[in-house]
């Protein structure tokens, strides 16, 4: 390919809406172009990258025995209603684009395909003899993101590989889950990425257990916590740990404390000579359920700890056996809208009276009370007195009428001691999620009544797994992990081209002839070469070559008359002066050795 025919348009200035390096470089390098918020065109260079990633993914999926297919992007609402996910994905801040056809039938643009694939499996897989089966597809998905950002990292249209497996028993599902784990690690390694596999929350997909694959990068949206010995890693949403030990509050009689303008843990502790671990703080949350119920929740947690809202959502879902759309703090304006008397915010205790909800217009008229073990394990503590500007000291749970249901709700932090070995300390890293695998169990097969006949002749629901990789996100994550101040540094296996030949002066006949000769030889050797034959100044070509990040650069310049060229490796910036023949030999050897083909 010749640059003059590539439609390469590079930018010198950083686009105003690009916040992170990878987004900036992909725009500046002419790889992508914004069409509208969260939607991008993949230009020729980017499409070559995406095709290479896709090829690696297909090879590794095929090697597991998975079968490639293609499912419809438009999905009927009826299937999603049967699984119980339509309301959660479309109401309020739901992420599914949805529409009505000419007959008034509701449809959704697929952000994921559990419902469709489960319905198909129920029709096609009738006997245990047909199992296990894994189907996968690579296609565009859609999410109506509230705040699209970071280019392809959080867009509204993106390319994804999603696979779904069907099994006759849980043990067989576990085997495929492990096989997918290994396949994913090979995929990311072949793509030249450093990744960490971490325990993860299953989120809206659901299921018994899941694991994310994170590309480590400073700009990562996710916080991951890793033990020093490497034996534990988890997304912060899922992480568990030992909290710091509390400093005991000396036992004393219950007494009221006047606490004006002490409505936060910090101001309370400063004024009263306390430390945060001696205080039980109470968070008043509103849970919104898929069935429309609005449930006020009192969460008690030690004063030095933070609430993990994902853990709270999961706890509520387990406690009430129904889906939770979201949780959020209750505000004074919401209380007014419910026609309730004002609550003593900043001084609320675990025993806040249910009577405060008696006149609520749309909320459940009692509090659901939960407490984190950091709070329930305190023998004596300070808490709100349920009166403005009043707290109580010397409190115990028995004096409050009993301990609320205890469940892990705290947010693990760097510096916490590890569960598996209390001598190990959690360390913090940032990560970009590029893959996620789930053991779904029977959540979808039961909801959609997708069954097979087992070896006893009776019907039972499939055991299922699902396995996703963000193809377009992976491409940008590679740039985030491999770049410098001058531009991208693509790993060889997914680079749009393997070599770029830069002719310093295209008007020089000797330079042009040597470049054309080397270009032809590289093509004949099945090396993907890009020839910069533009009439631009040499400096412009060199800057563009650095920016677009081709792994190897050959500069044909003033030494062309002597048959010599410069060979430059993009990743290391190492420069060698070689004859054209030596450069050709070195390129063939290195590229053959580093292709990252499947073994």
Curated annotation (Swiss-Prot):
Enzyme class: ligase
Record flagged with keyword Protein biosynthesis: yes
Reaction equation(s) it catalyzes: tRNA(Pro) + L-proline + ATP = L-prolyl-tRNA(Pro) + AMP + diphosphate
Pfam families, sorted: HGTP_anticodon (PF03129), tRNA-synt_2b (PF00587), tRNA_edit (PF04073)
GO terms under cellular component: cytosol
Top-level taxonomic group: Bacteria
InterPro entries, per database record: aa-tRNA-synt_IIb, aa-tRNA-synth_II, aa-tRNA-synth_II/BPL/LPL, Anticodon-bd, Anticodon-bd_dom_sf, Pro-tRNA-ligase_IIa, Pro-tRNA-synth_IIa_bac-type, Pro-tRNA-Synthase_IIa_type1
Protein keywords: Aminoacyl-tRNA synthetase, ATP-binding, Cytoplasm, Ligase, Nucleotide-binding, Protein biosynthesis
One GO term of the biological process aspect: prolyl-tRNA aminoacylation
EC number(s) recorded for this UniProt protein: 6.1.1.15
GO molecular function, a single term: aminoacyl-tRNA deacylase activity
Intracellular or extracellular location(s): Cytoplasm
PROSITE patterns xrefs: AA_TRNA_LIGASE_II
Keyword Nucleotide-binding: yes
SUPFAM superfamilies: Class II aaRS ABD-related, Class II aaRS and biotin synthetases, YbaK/ProRS associated domain
Annotated family: Belongs to the class-II aminoacyl-tRNA synthetase family. ProS type 1 subfamily.
Biological role: Catalyzes the attachment of proline to tRNA(Pro) in a two-step reaction: proline is first activated by ATP to form Pro-AMP and then transferred to the acceptor end of tRNA(Pro). As ProRS can inadvertently accommodate and process non-cognate amino acids such as alanine and cysteine, to avoid such errors it has two additional distinct editing activities against alanine. One activity is designated as 'pretransfer' editing and involves the tRNA(Pro)-independent hydrolysis of activated Ala-AMP.
Entry domain remark: Consists of three domains: the N-terminal catalytic domain, the editing domain and the C-terminal anticodon-binding domain.
Subunit-level organization: Homodimer.
HAMAP family (alphabetical): Pro_tRNA_synth_type1
Full protein name: Proline--tRNA ligase
Encoding gene, per UniProt annotation: proS
């Amino acid at each position: 390919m010749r640059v003059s025919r590539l439609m390469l348009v590079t930018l010198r200035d950083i686009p105003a809406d690009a916040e992170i390096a990878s987004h900036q470089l992909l725009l500046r390098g002419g790889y992508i172009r914004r069409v509208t918020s969260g939607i991008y065109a993949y230009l020729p260079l980017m499409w070559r990258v995406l095709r290479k990633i896709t090829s690696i993914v297909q090879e590794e999926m095929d090697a597991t025995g998975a079968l490639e297919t293609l499912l419809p992007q438009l999905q009927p609402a009826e299937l999603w209603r049967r699984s119980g996910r339509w309301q959660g994905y479309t109401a309020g801040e739901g992420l599914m684009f949805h529409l009505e056809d000419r007959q008034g039938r509701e449809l959704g643009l697929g952000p994921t395909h559990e419902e469709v694939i489960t319905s198909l499996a129920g029709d096609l897989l009738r006997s245990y003899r047909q199992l296990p089966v894994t189907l996968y597809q690579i296609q565009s998905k859609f999410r109506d993101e509230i705040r699209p950002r970071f280019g392809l990292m959080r867009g509204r249209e993106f390319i994804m590989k999603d696979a779904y497996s069907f099994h006759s028993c849980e043990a067989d599902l576990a085997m495929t889950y492990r096989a997918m784990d290994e396949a994913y690690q090979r995929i990311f390694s072949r793509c030249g990425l450093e990744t960490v596999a971490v325990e993860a929350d299953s989120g809206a997909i659901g299921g018994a257990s899941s694991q994310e694959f994170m590309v480590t990068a400073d700009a990562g949206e996710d916080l991951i916590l890793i033990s020093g010995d490497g034996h534990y890693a988890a997304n912060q949403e899922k992480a568990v740990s030992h909290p710091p030990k509390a400093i005991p509050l000396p036992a004393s009689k219950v007494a009221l404390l006047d606490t004006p303008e002490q409505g936060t843990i910090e101001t309370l502790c400063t004024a009263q000579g306390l430390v945060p671990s001696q205080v039980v703080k109470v968070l008043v949350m509103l849970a919104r359920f898929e069935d429309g119920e609005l449930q006020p929740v009192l969460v008690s947690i030690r004063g030095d700890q933070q609430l993990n809202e994902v853990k709270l959502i999961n706890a509520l879902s387990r406690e009430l056996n129904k889906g939770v759309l979201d949780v959020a703090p209750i505000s004074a304006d919401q209380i007014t809208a419910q026609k309730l008397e004002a609550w003593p915010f900043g001084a609320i205790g675990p025993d806040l009276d249910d009577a405060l909800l008696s006149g609520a217009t749309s909320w459940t008229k009692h509090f659901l009370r939960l407490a984190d073990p950091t709070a329930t394990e305190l023998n004596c503590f300070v808490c709100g007195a349920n009166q403005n500007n009043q707290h109580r000291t010397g409190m115990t749970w028995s004096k409050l009428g009993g301990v609320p249901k205890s469940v892990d709700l705290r947010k693990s932090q760097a510096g916490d001691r590890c569960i598996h070995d209390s001598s190990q300390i959690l360390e913090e890293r940032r990560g970009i999620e590029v893959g996620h695998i789930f053991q779904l169990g029977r959540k979808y097969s039961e909801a959609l009544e997708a069954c097979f006949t087992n070896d006893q002749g009776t019907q039972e629901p499939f055991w299922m797994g699902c396995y996703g990789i963000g193809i377009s996100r992976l491409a940008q994550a590679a740039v985030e992990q491999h770049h410098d101040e001058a531009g991208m540094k693509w790993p060889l296996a997914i680079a749009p081209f393997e070599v770029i030949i830069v002719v310093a002066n295209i008007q020089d006949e000797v330079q042009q002839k040597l470049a054309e000769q080397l270009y032809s030889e590289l093509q004949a050797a099945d090396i993907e070469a890009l020839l910069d034959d533009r009439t631009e100044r040499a400096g412009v070509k060199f800057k563009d070559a650095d920016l677009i990040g081709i792994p190897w650069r050959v500069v044909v310049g003033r030494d062309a008359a002597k048959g010599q060229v410069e060979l430059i490796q993009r990743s290391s910036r190492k420069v060698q002066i070689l004859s054209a023949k030596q450069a050709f030999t070195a390129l063939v050897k290195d590229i053959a050795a580093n292709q990252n083909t499947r073994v």
